[in-house]
A protein has these predicted regions:
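Conserved GHKL (Bergerat-fold) ATPase module
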Residues: 1-185
Length: 185
């Protein structure tokens, strides 16, 4: 394993680009070769190792996009997941999210960005959003076009607010795409 870890540190990025650039054509071959840093373990793990460490109640392969595992840990959305015993994969390369979009799933488990607004959502959230409707509307009006919506969430533990993404393109993917030539600002 030590030899493969060294190999992956040198050529892992090319494996991920191979997965993405081939539009997932070689995903059956490449999916077991790519690795990501585990926030919990602080080392590279394969997708198989990550899924094998799942608890019975875990439905998703959770990931956060940041340059380091510590940066993923610092995201408000990660605190509750880690406290509940879930691991989070650190996607530190620009291509990581694009590559897993080509995979779609791994062993019937979907990939889920921890910044996705649905992570940690509960039926209790809907009730609280209805109860606090006037306050949330006032906050949205005060913030204007800076946010698309304001809502209550039980997904956070010790942080009062967070940014989340909605839809297929995450905040990090938007940054990568906006940095490309001919990107509209």
């Amino acid at each position: 394993r030590e030899t493969y870890d060294k190999f992956f540190k040198n050529f892992g990025l090319q494996l991920k680009y191979g997965l993405y650039s081939g539009w997932g054509m070689n995903k059956e071959v490449l999916q077991d070769l790519i690795m990501f840093k585990s926030v919990k373990l602080g080392k590279y793990v394969t997708l198989k190792e990550y899924v094998d460490s799942f608890g019975e109640d875990q439905k998703y392969i959770y990931y956060g996009s940041a340059k380091t595992e510590d940066a993923v840990k610092a995201l408000p959305q990660s605190e509750k997941l880690l406290d509940e015993g879930y691991d989070i994969l650190c996607f530190s390369d620009d291509v990581d999210e694009f590559a897993v979009k080509m995979l779609g799933k791994y062993e019937d488990k979907e990939f889920k960005n921890i910044l996705d607004e649905s992570v940690g959502a509960s039926p209790e959230d809907d009730k609280k959003n209805e109860e606090d409707k006037d306050l949330l509307e006032a906050l949205k009006n005060a913030l204007g076009d800076k946010v698309s919506k304001v809502k209550v969430s039980t997904a956070l533990k010790n942080h009062p607010v967070c940014l989340s993404s909605e839809g297929e393109v995450s905040i990090e993917m938007e940054k990568v795409l906006s940095g490309m030539p001919n990107a509209e600002a």
